[in-house]
A protein has these predicted regions:
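ATP-binding N-lobe of GHMP and related small-molecule kinases
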Residues: 1-112, 130-139, 174-176, 186
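Residue-level signal for inorganic ion chemistry
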Residues: 11, 50, 79, 117, ...
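Generic non-transmembrane alpha-helical segments
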Residues: 82-92, 140, 144-147, 241, ...
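A short, flexible low-complexity segment enriched in Lys/Arg and Gly/Pro that occurs
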Residues: 80-99, 126, 222-242
Length: 289
């Protein structure tokens, strides 16, 4: 079984309050980006390729990682953790699960605010569930996903959704960006979660993102903001410069995704976005929405 693993964009992100457990309640709109329906021989560069099969040779689960280097010990890789968590739930239910062989070809950038690692984990959970005859119900999968990361539950759904809480409480939204293009720029900047939240002052959202589909995209620049930009851009001015450059190159809306460091711009047509992409030397990805 092979899946092409897409990323996500945050359209608007408000840090609403700090919780008693030390986490923060957020409000954001997740939008999938980079989905691909091609073949392994001709993939888009903006997706990961995940293959999972039953390992008939025995000897336990077998993992192979290709493509971009993942800078963490294997046992901390989210795909490995997803398999172990899924197997643990099966053991707890006295459900048999065969050994698996997993190959992850990594293309999505990490540390980008695009949810690449979370997407890999969520796709792993969904694929394992299908391969084992859908042994786990949706609630169980969601619980495992949340234990792996706040973005993981979204990728189980993988469609435009409003998210609250730490990012796990979803509401349907009416938003379609069919025909639009996204230019995503990922500079060589790493922003830790600690740094991202250090300069944040929680506040009420400026705009209710549940109503984003009713607001013309031409007006998003005025109302739809990512709260992290206010604290991160002064510390990393090159990120703010990228956002302004996207606007200068014709973007109708531009924003940082998540806590960065990717900056994206939305464009109406292919000609404009191709020209915009030519203005950046590296770390750029053009995606049709």
């Amino acid at each position: 079984m092979i899946e092409f693993v897409n990323a996500k964009l945050n359209i608007g992100l408000s840090v609403v309050r700090r919780r008693s457990d030390g986490y923060h309640d957020l409000e954001t709109l997740f939008y999938p980006v980079g989905r691909f329906n091609g073949t392994p021989e001709n993939p888009t560069p903006f997706c990961d390729i995940l293959e999972i099969t039953v390992n008939h040779s025995g000897g336990g689960d077998d993992f192979q990682f290709l493509g971009r280097h993942i800078d963490c010990p294997p046992e901390k890789n989210l795909v490995v953790r997803a398999v172990n968590a899924f197997r643990g739930e099966c053991v707890a239910r006295d459900v048999a699960m065969p050994d698996m062989k997993l190959t992850l070809e990594k293309h999505l950038p990490d540390g980008a605010g695009l949810g690449g690692g979370s997407a890999d984990a969520a796709f792993t959970l969904n694929m394992l569930n299908r391969l084992t005859g859908r042994r786990l119900e949706k609630e169980a999968l969601s619980g495992i996903a949340l234990s792996l990361g706040a973005d993981c539950p979204f990728f189980l759904e993988n469609r435009p959704l409003f998210a609250g809480g730490v990012g796990e409480r979803f509401e349907e939204v009416s938003l379609k960006l069919d025909g639009w293009w996204a230019l995503i720029v990922k500079p060589e900047v790493y922003i830790s979660t600690k740094e991202a939240f250090a300069g944040i002052s929680p506040r009420a959202p400026r705009f209710d993102l549940r109503n984003l589909g009713k607001l013309p995209i031409e007006e998003w620049k005025e109302y739809v903001v990512n709260d992290f930009e206010a604290s991160i851009f002064p510390a990393h001015p090159e990120l703010g410069a990228i956002k302004e450059k996207l606007y200068d190159c014709g973007a109708v809306y531009a924003s940082m995704s998540g806590s960065g460091s990717s900056i994206y711009g939305l464009y109406r047509d292919e000609e404009t976005i191709r020209h915009a992409a030519s203005m950046f030397d590296r770390g750029k990805y053009v995606c049709k929405l």
